[in-house]
Amino acid sequence: MLRAVGSLLRLGRGLTVRCGPGAPLEATRRPAPALPPRGLPCYSSGGAPSNSGPQGHGEIHRVPTQRRPSQFDKKILLWTGRFKSMEEIPPRIPPEMIDTARNKARVKACYIMIGLTIIACFAVIVSAKRAVERHESLTSWNLAKKAKWREEAALAAQAKAK
């Protein structure tokens, strides 16, 4: 990597050459600057980063270790069985606990919807069998509706002719 900074030409890490007008052409070795660690620091439940030490360039935003649950979150925590009553729920809860409870609630809601869908399928089957016993079908309904429309059109044509 070549970078021209003022009258210096930097050739990669630690190798600098003076390249200004009238400057002697010499290469000097400088120690490479310490680079900040790559990636985001991992936070433990205590709130301190695992690779704590002098931070490099810029600030690192801390992730809150606990948050106050909303009423909806409290209901989800109760519904998923994490707590037995509203009084047992602490004022501050780790976000992982809320996420886990929400995921369990999503799964329970999906199971409920699957069950309701199966019940609705059986209800449609039963109602269709009853309609067959009464000799009802969509074809007979459509034929009756079209016959009614023809009668109304014929009556309208007779009234118009008079």
Curated annotation (Swiss-Prot):
Transmembrane segment boundaries: 107-127
InterPro entries linked to this entry: DUF1075 (IPR009432)
Subcellular compartments: Membrane
Key words of the record: Membrane, Transmembrane, Transmembrane helix
Region (Disordered): 26-69
Membrane topology listed for this record: Single-pass membrane protein
UniProt GO cellular component terms: membrane
Sequence similarity: Belongs to the UPF0389 family.
PANTHER family cross-referenced by the UniProt entry: GROWTH AND TRANSFORMATION-DEPENDENT PROTEIN (PTHR13674), PROTEIN FAM162B (PTHR13674:SF3)
Protein name: Protein FAM162B
Biological source species: Homo sapiens (Human)
